UniProtKB/Swiss-Prot annotation:
Protein's name in the database: Large ribosomal subunit protein eL42
Ribosomal protein keyword on record: yes
Keyword field: Antibiotic resistance, Cycloheximide resistance, Ribonucleoprotein, Ribosomal protein
GO molecular function: structural constituent of ribosome
PANTHER family: 60S RIBOSOMAL PROTEIN L36A/L44
Cellular component terms (Gene Ontology): cytosolic large ribosomal subunit
Amino acid sequence: MVNIPKTRRTYCKGKACRKHTPHKVTQYKKGKDSLSAQGKRRYDRKQSGYGGQTKPVFHKKAKTTKKVVLRLECTVCKTKHQLALKRCKHFELGGDKKQRGAAISF
């Protein structure tokens, strides 16, 4: 279980800052695939008409987790940069902190 706070003081590369400032932390999410990308246009053209599936469908999945990517936004100049963490099964953003000597509950 990885628990990351919602704010973090870290270095800002923005031209206005170039120093340590508070950053707002969010989790990176993949955007929607563009229908006008060259590969998608080619694939759709190839798929149309008779002949079934024309390219191999990938089945040999090897990884069980994805790397968590944090999106850090500077609260001063609004510059954004990304930071990759290690792989983990459970990721939490801004969850409760662990208490010393507290009983474990599931």
